[in-house]
């Protein structure tokens, strides 16, 4: 049995809607209802911990809508459902968006009951777009709104995205990088997302790399030789002992340059202060400290 494809392309998106949007569209068409209507996208209520949301995805959605259309294959599949008239499907095959879309610029803070995207079109067309537009905008707005809180909590310190493995599917992982860029993150570990959306790539090393070597010193040395000014992960066994090993490595091989050490577990605040003390005392105040491990705005605020 042939497995269905998991990939979704732009040409598939005309069918990315709820069934009732299409059945209402057919009813509007059959009744000759062509009056213009305005559909507004806004937050009626914000969560108790949020003062604003960061609008994102609406300009992408607006551009996409202008390219939407139904292919012959899609019309055939709709006909197979038995819910649509042949003359309606013939009309749908010629359909393209004829309305207007208004949006605030992406990256604009928005508040309760403040529209940040409006579709003004014949009511049938505006109705058809509702589910797709809300899906496109909701994802990126939610991600950007969380990300900007993290950026604000970090202040002058750059924030990187290492969240690919926890994102809810491939589409969210790639489009999430676009939202992170809008929110002001400095880089991402997501290669596809970063290259597609023009965001600098950033990465360090994994605990598995450390464990693949005989000891931490061997892992640090090999990685630093290949990648000057790299970031070394120091918490696989003992965080502060890992920092001492990095210091010893830089002293033993003066040509090796280490840009930062990364802390990924434990009491990050206490360990960061300890690492800073060790590095400064050894004459390596230029080596930065990177903290990771599920950090959100609350944890970052406590750290800085």
Question: What kind of region is each of these model predictions?
Answer:
Residues 2-36, 45-47, 83, 89-98, ...:
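Buried, small/hydrophobic-residue-enriched core segments of structured protein domains
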Residues 33, 37-93:
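N-terminal, Lys/Arg-enriched amphipathic/low-complexity engagement segments
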Residues 292:
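Short acidic/histidine-rich active-site segments
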